[in-house]
Design a protein with these regions (language model features):
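Catalytic Walker B motif of ABC-type/P-loop ATPase nucleotide-binding domains
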Residues: 200-203
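Conserved ABC transporter NBD signature motif
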Residues: 93-101
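ABC ATPase NBD coupling module
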Residues: 48-51, 102-119, 152
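Helix N-cap at the start of a conserved alpha-helix in ABC-type nucleotide-binding domains
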Residues: 211-213
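Short coil-to-helix segment of the ABC ATPase nucleotide-binding domain corresponding to the Q-loop/switch region
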Residues: 132-141
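Conserved ABC ATPase "signature" region
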Residues: 100-101, 140, 147, 152-171
């Protein structure tokens, strides 16, 4: 399931758009899983103490999805993103992206993976762009480092196409300090797309931006997803971003705890509205996490009563201690 590439020939934007158009099902989701995480574990040791950042996390993301990952600080979001980016290795479990086994791949495969399969956008613009290069030079750099013999003219055309696609063609010859924060982040997305990756990972890409610039950056990520068919995974605390994607996955205590799926529907007046439905995640052992707000509101602690009904399960506070 590895991404096909011709030596020295980057995948053009027009070809990516054609693939995106024919690769999606009627509901907009692609047929094949791109990311598969199965009981993923990551343990860190600090001052002789083991900390389990991921505690058996399960996640499946299909090709062509635009998904947000949310969760409190320390929930495991950044750890997951670093593993998917090839910057860290799981302690146990399984994780594959586009056919690459992130647990067992060697150094050469990891380098190829990071160059060809995944693109990363950091929150801090300084980590995305080299300050002494123009936007065009920053975008061209990954192509030059990728090892393919791309003709200079074709490379220049692709740089221009990417910058124009993301609305920063006017920044072609500007260095980062001459761009606004939003322009820098959109240029960073172009850099991440340089080698036509299957997956874009964005870690709080709007975290340092005002609301207008944040909207422009999110629109750019949506454009990449819709026009090119690139799978996009965004870690965010921005509620406006999390609520604007079709799927939002929440992580709590190192596990996926719940998801919100959104779809368009017509109300009683015939107007289009977005309908959101929240689901809890059930792991292979049959465990689920109640949404924190539910447990707090009903004062559910330590244990709860459950009862099987014909078509659902009820969960009740344990009142036996009050008797």
């Amino acid at each position: 399931m590895r991404r096909e590439r011709r030596e020295g020939t980057p995948v053009g934007l027009a070809e990516l758009e054609r693939r995106a158009a024919r690769g999606r099902d009627d509901d907009g989701r692609d047929r094949n899983a791109l990311i598969v995480c199965d009981r993923l574990v990551r343990i860190f040791t600090a001052d002789g103490v083991e900390v389990q950042a991921l505690q058996g996390l399960d996640l499946l993301v299909e090709r062509g999805e635009l998904t947000a990952i949310v969760g409190a600080s320390g929930s495991g979001k950044s750890t997951l993103l670093n593993i998917l980016a090839g910057l860290d290795t799981p302690s146990a479990g399984a994780a594959t992206v586009a056919g690459f086994d992130l647990v067992t791949m060697d150094a050469a495969a990891r380098l190829r993976y990071r160059r060809e399969v995944v693109g990363f956008v950091w929150q801090q613009a300084a980590r995305n762009l080299l300050p002494y290069l123009t936007a065009a030079q920053n975008v061209a750099l990954p192509m030059r480092l990728g090892g393919g013999r791309i003709p200079r003219r074709r490379r220049a055309e692709r740089v221009r196409e990417l910058l124009d696609l993301l609305g920063v063609g006017h920044c072609h010859d500007r260095v980062p300090e001459r761009m606004s924060g939003g322009e820098r982040q959109r240029a960073a997305i172009a850099v991440a797309l340089a080698n036509a990756p299957a997956l874009i990972l964005a870690d709080e890409p709007t975290g340092e931006l005002d609301s207008r610039a944040a909207e422009e950056v999110f629109t750019a990520l949506r454009t990449v997803n819709e026009r090119l068919g690139t799978t996009v995974l965004i870690v965010t605390h921005d509620a406006s971003v999390a609520s604007a994607v079709r799927r939002t996955v929440a992580i709590r205590d190192g596990r996926t705890s719940s998801e919100v799926l959104r779809r368009a529907a017509l109300d009683e007046h015939g107007d289009e509205v977005v309908v959101a439905q929240e689901y809890v995640t059930v792991d292979r052992a049959g465990r689920l996490q109640l949404p924190a707000g539910f447990a707090e509101r009903l004062s559910i602690r330590d244990r709860a009563r459950v009862a099987l009904q014909p078509d659902h399960i009820t969960v009740h506070r344990d009142d036996s201690r009050d008797a």
